[in-house]
């Protein structure tokens, strides 16, 4: 249930009208649909064409299904400010699934060849504060800033990003960042010592993270573990 709850908290909206998640990743939209189906709530996935490319929308809008969803998460849908309910986390696996799915819904990561930066973006102030506290509780050392009206929770230290990716179930991506970091350190050391250029090895993981994370969650997010 915790993973499905993250979709509600970090999607486009979540209230008495239902829930909507928009994403450029078709796999994420269908993953959200599968999560809700496992919880006994039926949703739909549609594709919308935009100038920048297709956007995939997962939604629960049928009144009967919306009522089941709200009861499942313990919300009325009329809350003036949306806040995360700790009661929806039964164990450590729930917290892992929630944070990992939140990243699928609103997270980004830069190419580690260029810089180390992992972010969660949300327009919901209190939810962002709570997510920041969750990450801090697990020693991922997050920071928060307001950028263009959106709350940005970001982690810049490579070792903390590696730890978070491993925590979320994307251990392979964490290892690739570690490899790139070691290469960058050796390259910088070599440049300082010999003042020469070294070969540029491409190990981009940005696109791969969401794919691996979704696949990992599909395997670990059984109904008894959400």
Regions found by a protein language model. Give the residues of each.
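Residue-level detector of conserved catalytic or cofactor/ligand-binding positions
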Residues: 216-226
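N-terminal ordered "arm"
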Residues: 1-31
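DNA-contacting interfaces and partner/effector-binding or oligomerization modules
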Residues: 23-181
């Amino acid at each position: 249930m915790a993973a499905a709850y993250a979709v509600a908290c970090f999607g486009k909206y979540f209230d008495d009208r239902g829930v909507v998640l928009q994403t450029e990743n078709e796999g994420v939209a269908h993953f959200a649909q599968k999560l809700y189906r496992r919880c006994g709530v039926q949703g739909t996935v549609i594709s919308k064409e935009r100038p920048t490319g297709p956007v995939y929308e997962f939604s629960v809008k049928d009144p009967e299904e919306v009522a089941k969803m709200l009861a499942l998460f313990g919300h009325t849908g009329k809350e003036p400010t949306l806040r995360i309910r700790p009661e929806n986390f039964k164990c450590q696996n729930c917290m892992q699934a929630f944070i990992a799915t939140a990243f699928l819904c609103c997270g980004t990561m830069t190419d580690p060849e260029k810089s180390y930066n992992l972010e969660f973006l949300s327009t919901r102030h209190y939810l962002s504060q709570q997510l920041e506290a969750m990450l801090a509780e697990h020693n991922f050392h997050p920071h928060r800033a307001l950028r263009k009206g959106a709350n940005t929770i970001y982690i810049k230290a490579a070792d903390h990003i590696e730890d978070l990716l491993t925590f979320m179930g994307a251990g392979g991506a964490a290892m690739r960042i570690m490899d790139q970091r070691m290469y960058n350190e050796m390259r910088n050391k070599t440049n300082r010592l010999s003042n020469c250029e070294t070969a540029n090895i491409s190990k981009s993981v940005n696109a791969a993270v969401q794919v691996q994370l979704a696949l990992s969650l599909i395997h670990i997010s059984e109904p008894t573990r959400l």
